[in-house]
Amino acid sequence: MALPSSSLSSQIHTGATTQCIPHFHGSLNAGTSAGKRRSLYLRWGKDNQAKKFGPSKIVACAGQDPFSVPTLVKREFPPGFWKDHVIESLMPSYKVAPSDEKRIETLITEIKNMFRSMGYGETNPSAYDTAWVARIPAVDGSEKPQFPETLEWILQNQLKDGSWGEEFYFLAYDRILATLACIITLTIWQTGDTQVQKGIEFFKTQAGKIEEEADSHRPSGFEIVFPAMLKEAKALGLDLPYELPFIQQIIEKREAKLQRLPPDLLYALPTTLLYSLEGLQEIVDWEKIMKLQSKDGSFLSSPASTAAVFMRTGNKKCLEFLNFVLKKFGNHVPCHYPLDLFERLWAVDTVERLGIDHHFKEEIKDALDYVYSHWDERGIGWARENPVPDIDDTAMGLRILRLHGYNVSSDVLKTFRDENGEFFCFLGQTQRGVTDMLNVNRCSHVAFPGETIMEEAKLCTERYLRNALEDTGAFDKWALKKNIRGEVEYALKYPWHRSMPRLEARSYIENYGPNDVWLGKTMYMMPNISNEKYLELAKLDFNRVQFFHRQELQDIRRWWNSSGFSQLGFTRERVAEIYFSPASFLFEPEFATCRAVYTKTSNFTVILDDLYDAHGTLDNLKLFSESVKRWDLSLVDQMPQDMKICFKGFYNTFNEIAEEGRKRQGRDVLSYIQKVWEVQLEAYTKEAEWSAVRYVPSYDEYIGNASVSIALGTVVLISALFTGEILTDDILSKIGRDSRFLYLMGLTGRLVNDTKTYQAERGQGEVASAVQCYMKDHPEISEEEALKHVYTIMDNALDELNREFVNNRDVPDTCRRLVFETARIMQLFYMDGDGLTLSHNMEIKEHVKNCLFQPVA
């Protein structure tokens, strides 16, 4: 009989956690009794680095013949980092105060009201567009403005420096454009001489700053409307520096752009040129252009463009649109309106990325129902009646609607792909922005099987975004954000399948700008998208949830210690890392019990994996499995001491879990839990048997067992009982062992594990992995080719997992999340290597710290 680990440790003291795995010399008889194994050791030093004992990195036990019997390589794990004293040292002083709870409730109410009050979109005044509307002469023929309140607004809203625009943010392009529009309007109406002179002085002294700004900050249509207005200003006799080099350059750009414009394109179909008709008045056929008027009477939602058309045509629908906008805003107009689809989609995206969406489920549903009711297979724009779709709103809509279960097709992206396979924001546009390409990239990761357009979008946008990170001038065509670079870096490093909600929330809290602005024809703000309330709630909520998580982790540490598991010398102690898993995705306070069950079950899968994988003899493993099957504590007397600790802890823990499950489900669940574990232990046993005889199965045989032995299904099937839902047998079957959903979770988890660990485990004597088994089936291919094929299988399975997650609506939402997020956490843990075993010197350690111990400021 093999010695228990305590005796092995007394022979050769390693000072670290160790594990034996079967390792046979090729000349040995594979049928040698599993009860007569010899042990070899690999040591970990105090610096957690492997100690090498010669070329083989092993050392034989004294007094044993190295060729007489099958051997074991004794695998050692680095000790756990998150010991009690480490956790205690990191405990912040933060506690949830009653005032915090009250403030959270207040903010939730205010944000709910914000969502419920959403109409056509809230935004700020545009001095530029207001100046164009103020030009309109009265329709009654009097020599007065049709909208005198807009003229008065211009007179009252000049800034101290003589410019017009947003006071808190200086963008030379925006200020110069708005100021030029306002002084022209005041000159036309022969009023505000003082304001005009101050505006001219501002223009003269500040226009040159445009040369210092990035081209990407140039507002939409600037090269069209700015030269046209300069021509007007010159005709009005305004004393401006018309000969400045940059002005001449912009005029040349305009001429070149107009020369490239096909004569009939302007009238063939709606394009972004409709947004800037005020700058094209000398070439527009006003009768033809009316065919492209939007249903609401506007031209691409632009008050300035619509005002110019009205002054040329007297079209009543144009006037109705302008009256509609002024009825909403009073004495000014924004740069475009409505913005109803844009506002709703970005507001939903904001609360989701900040991690506060769980407070606004009804509001989110209402917002998305509205967007979906205006969804178009050709794409959508920023407003429901916008005739020109854009990839930014379309990609955001496709991703969010799909993830919330709405039936939307990825074919919608084909509208925005040119003949070279590149993606663009608007039809006929060649320049792209970082924010729109970022949204397409985020969208591309929620692909379903066979959606080649999504794969093409992913590759195209990844290439663009990586180049953008190297080019500071690429930030950004459509927005001035606090840290768009940080958003891009996060998206590329943690794409959808490894972006856990708590980590994304932490990152976005740091990157989110409550004063972010967007770039249209002028700079504009969206207060229902960017505001301090979202950020304040996100910080308070994150710290509050984190406080509860720390308390739960301490409870689980006490369970671990009281169960005697810290005495086990053969297994990995990764309590904090394992608790981090459910805390990173099922983080809401109401799921505390589910997190505890998930963590305890996961810890047992690690203990028993290490036990069955290498430590126990086959006889003892079969005894352990039989004890679980019979649920018989008396059999423990026949076990070695460390296995006694395992089984007693297992037996007591799952009796407690079953009792709690009975209360929640209203029926006995112990037999269900037993059966879940029986299947799991059968998979472990099969792997142990394969290892004992160095059997390399076929790929299909291996995956059939390995997708179970990865143990994710066991964790999910038991934890699901505590998601707050009554789970009928029918529901359980939809996430059960025979379900495609659960299989894909196990498959992707197994494959990402194998791709990152097979080389190290092969060096330690393991003979079966997805890569090795595939190579056995296909001896003609190289290891590199086999690895590439396994990655392809995994990527395809992740796409299918997306579809199962989205379409499996018969399964309660929390159960769907449990399955899907468990698959995602595996992608995170194994993104760069074995993030569980080697968590002490990998990024997982920082994730644990940021998620559980570091409050946000």
UniProtKB/Swiss-Prot annotation:
Q: Please list the residues that bind substrate.
A: K257, K477
Q: Give the UniProt keywords, A-Z.
A: Chloroplast, Isomerase, Lyase, Magnesium, Metal-binding, Multifunctional enzyme, Plant defense, Plastid, Transit peptide
Q: Motif DXDD motif — list its residue ranges.
A: 390-393
Residues that bind Mg(2+) 2, according to the entry? D609, D613
Where located? Plastid, Chloroplast
Positions contributing to Mg(2+) 3 binding = N753, T757, E761
What InterPro entries does UniProt report for this protein, alphabetically? Isoprenoid_synthase_dom_sf, Terpene_cyclase-like_1_C, Terpene_cyclase_plant_C1, Terpene_synth_N, Terpene_synth_N_sf, Terpene_synthase-like, Terpene_synthase_metal-bd, Terpenoid_cyclase/PrenylTrfase
- Annotated function: Involved in defensive oleoresin formation in conifers in response to insect attack or other injury. Involved in diterpene (C20) olefins biosynthesis. Bifunctional enzyme that catalyzes two sequential cyclizations of geranylgeranyl diphosphate (GGPP) to levopimaradiene. Levopimaradiene is the major products of the enzyme with abietadiene and neoabietadiene. No activity with farnesyl diphosphate (FPP) as substrate.
* Entry-linked PANTHER family: (E,E)-GERANYLLINALOOL SYNTHASE (PTHR31739:SF25), ENT-COPALYL DIPHOSPHATE SYNTHASE, CHLOROPLASTIC (PTHR31739)
- In Swiss-Prot or TrEMBL terms, this protein is called Bifunctional levopimaradiene synthase, chloroplastic
